Design a protein with these regions (language model features):
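Glycine-rich phosphate/adenylate-binding loop and adjacent beta-alpha elements
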Residues: 1-34
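A glycine-rich, Thr/Ser-enriched phosphate-binding loop motif common to dinucleotide/cofactor-binding enzymes
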Residues: 17-23, 39-61, 73-81
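Short helix-loop-beta connector
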Residues: 41-42, 63-69, 133-134
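Adenosine-nucleotide cofactor-binding segment
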Residues: 72-73, 80, 87-150
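Conserved acidic E/D residue at the C-terminus of a beta-strand in Rossmann-like folds
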Residues: 98-99, 165, 190
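C-terminal hydrophobic helical "lid"/dimerization subdomain
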Residues: 145, 149-153, 193, 197-244
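Helix-to-beta-strand junctions that scaffold the AdoMet/dcAdoMet cofactor pocket
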Residues: 155-157
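Rossmann-fold dehydrogenase core element
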Residues: 159-162, 173-213
Length: 244
């Protein structure tokens, strides 16, 4: 999200992926990579278009059947947005597993049917209790190696797991025999191709609720303190925005 300050007639650049821009007051990008913020959507809300687009691409790869039961693991921005988008995609029940009661309460406010705090409950057992023999779709957003195996164990036979995170180490141990016995699919999801336009429309229509996910708005000159807060993992946060 941002304001266009200068628009050359044509900006020939192959890509933005190798260019600096993080925490900058200004950044130059090719015009074809820019989307108009819909009327009525604030700059703060529009800033969540990027994680929302990542979540939407993961949900599209999940190929959620109408009426399916879905488990989303992870209560951060991607998990929160993926859970809402699973609802929009036609799931009959969406369950979120996470580690903060406050974040799970926000998910409930945004329409998520059931939540599981994995510090207090067994995710696999509780997910099976809340569904018919397990969720048909699991979207894993936490990046926890253990959570990926939770997804495998909780999944209903013939179901699909979508992993949309980055895991510790070059390799992750997965119970592949269980994947095979369940005749399941394990799918990776990277970035957000062709997803910005749709999520901006969902956000503008109010179907995708992003304002409750913005837990902090800080000035750019407090960046160092914000990074310390995030690394400390002691304060509840979902999305932290910096304003120049």
């Amino acid at each position: 999200a941002g304001e266009a300050l200068h628009r050359p007639a044509e900006l020939r650049r192959p890509s933005y992926k190798n260019r600096q821009g993080v925490f900058a007051e200004y950044v130059a990008v090719p015009q074809r990579h820019v989307y108009k913020i819909p009327d009525g959507l604030s700059m703060e809300e529009a800033a969540l278009a990027e994680p929302a687009a990542t979540a939407m691409y993961a949900v599209s790869k999940a190929k959620i059947p109408a009426g399916a039961e879905v488990l989303v693991i992870g209560d951060g921005p991607i998990g929160q947005l993926a859970a809402q988008l699973a609802n929009i995609a036609g799931a009959s029940k969406v369950i979120m597993a996470g580690s903060w009661d406050e974040k799970l309460a926000i998910a409930k406010e945004c329409g998520i049917h059931e939540t599981i705090n994995y510090h207090k409950e067994d995710v696999v057992q509780r997910a099976k209790e809340l569904t018919e023999a397990g969720p048909e779709i699991v979207i894993e957003t936490s990046g926890s190696n253990a959570a990926l195996n939770m997804a495998v164990q909780a999944l209903k036979p013939t179901g699909r797991i979508v992993a949309v995170s980055w895991y510790n180490g070059a390799n992750v141990d997965v119970a592949m025999n269980t994947v095979i016995v369940k005749d399941a699919e394990l799918v990776g999801s990277l970035a957000s191709p062709n997803s910005f336009g749709p999520v901006l429309r969902y956000m503008a229509s109010g179907k995708l609720k992003v304002k409750p996910l913005i837990t902090h708005v800080k000035p750019l000159n407090e960046l160092e303190d914000v990074v310390k807060m995030i690394r400390g993992k002691k304060e509840m946060r979902i999305k932290v925005l910096l304003k120049p």
